[in-house]
Amino acid sequence: MSPDPLTLAAAEQARNVAVQMMAERGRGLVLVGAARLDLALEHLLKAVMAPSADPDDKLFTPDRSLGSYGAKISLAARLGLIEAPIEQALHAIRSVRNDFAHSAGEPTLAEPRHQKRLQRVYPEAEPSPLWIALAPLLQSQSGLTAQEQSFILLVTTLVASIEACALLQTPFSPRATVRFRSR
């Protein structure tokens, strides 16, 4: 029996994310992972939104209300699209990403403050079938620290899960809309 299209799409997303992140080290690894999560959240939110009438929709551009990674996380949580442990993991990654992006030095995932944030969320993600399947493959990759391996596993698991969830969504359909005149 062949896997269903959703499983294949999630597997392809996971592979792409893992390959992208394994090509990076240090700051690049964290920034690429967080950027990929930001994009996955945008896909999830757009999947439940009515399409924009404006072909040049700027709702998700950096200077707009949903332009930040944090705003996307919060909205996805408030809409019930992600559960609390996923929200916590995304915020932990956001905090690490912010530290890496604004550090003048050479930050590493081994630093205690980053480990403290991430160690809170790893136990929730580790039982994921995707994490379990990818962990041995990453362990065989030379040059990656244990912290980098765990971070890649977390981000890959999250991106694949969020993208798969986005594929299952349909646009929100309100029972009524606000109008100036009744129809």
Predicted regions and their residues:
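Amphipathic alpha-helical interface elements
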Residues: 1-183
